[in-house]
Amino acid sequence: MAREKIVIITRNMVGDGAERVIAQLSNYFAAQGKQCCIITLNDDEVFYKLDPSVSVLPVGQKSDNKLKDKLLRYRQVRKMVLQQKPDLVLSMPEEIGVYVLLALQGTKIPVYVSERNNPWVMPDVKVTRMLRTLMYPTAKGLIFQTEMAKSFFPESLQRKGVVLKNPVDPGRIPHQYQGQREKVIVGAGRLSSQKNMPLLLKAFARFAPNHPDYRLRIYGEGELREELTELARSLNIADQVELPGRSTALLEKMNSAAMFVLSSDYEGMPNVLLEAMCMGMPAISTDCPSGGPRELIRDGVNGLLIPVGDETALYNAMERMADPLFAGQMADAAYRIREELTSPEIFVSWYRYLFGEEPKSL
């Protein structure tokens, strides 16, 4: 029997990488004539433009007690899913997937979990990791971003899983910037420990005296905003550092910058790096597990890879990218992967795996 309705469950739709993937998949599924509903655990504002047929149902906070709140939220998730009567459920990121599998036990609804990070590190709560071991075998399918991430799991789970690239809508990715680039170094992502923005600030503090006309601009929100602001002040670079928050026009604002830097300690397949390269930006990234940046960047060919946490290596990479000739070569080579990364076949692969049928031509 054909699958006609999908429910996607996530934390929120406020602007992170997983949510961007959900927005693009939902719009594609809707264009294929499928019914699509997104359930969010939080009741934050929806950051992405969705097809009018895609509904978003927030759960929201249920209690001031952290444990009770989690239990009540997932009880509500179960109730909402049963009301929607979907043919399948897709959940992401991994922590959400663990608890969705638990909440939907006994419903006989097929649940797919999309791993979005480094499984050696995330989930970062011991109880959730234990539950992952127990619950993942009950999933209908698992979606991994890299072969390295897939290799973490036992053979039995690898057999029911698949590695799928992040879908990218070419219509929302600006083309390569033509003209003299701004003397701005851009970072973007959640202001959390995973992204290691302090590394970026410290490397920039070494770079700035040689390049006083450069600025560092970090887009995103998170719990470390005040800490980063204070660090910039203590490094005497506060007047060259900007933290503008989230932006609905992030890619357009990034595109003319001199370089993009991803300083993370670990990632899955980082959307923002992928999109920066699709725009033909000079890009620097840590060679972080679970291997996403390494699949995108060929060091010294279409960008620069540096060891995780290496401040000196990042500073040296910034100095290399400050050379317009070298940066231009890296940018042009990066731009050549746009066609591969924006291929409609990526959307088709997700559709085939989840719905078990061929999509219609759009």
PLM features: residue spans?
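A charged, aromatic-enriched C-terminal amphipathic alpha-helix characteristic of glycosyltransferases
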Residues: 325-355
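N-terminal strand-loop element at the rim of the active site
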Residues: 3, 8-69, 154
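Donor nucleotide-sugar binding/catalytic pocket of nucleotide-sugar-dependent glycosyltransferases
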Residues: 137-173
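Conserved acidic donor-binding segment of nucleotide-sugar-dependent glycosyltransferases
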Residues: 296-300, 304-311, 318-325
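Short hydrophobic beta-strand element within catalytic cores of glycosyltransferases
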Residues: 282-287
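A conserved mid-protein helix/loop that constitutes part of the nucleotide-sugar donor-binding site
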Residues: 16-24, 183, 190-209, 218, ...
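Aromatic "clamp/platform" in nucleotide-sugar-dependent glycosyltransferases that forms part
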Residues: 246, 265
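Short His-centered aromatic/hydrophobic patch
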Residues: 43, 91-97, 115
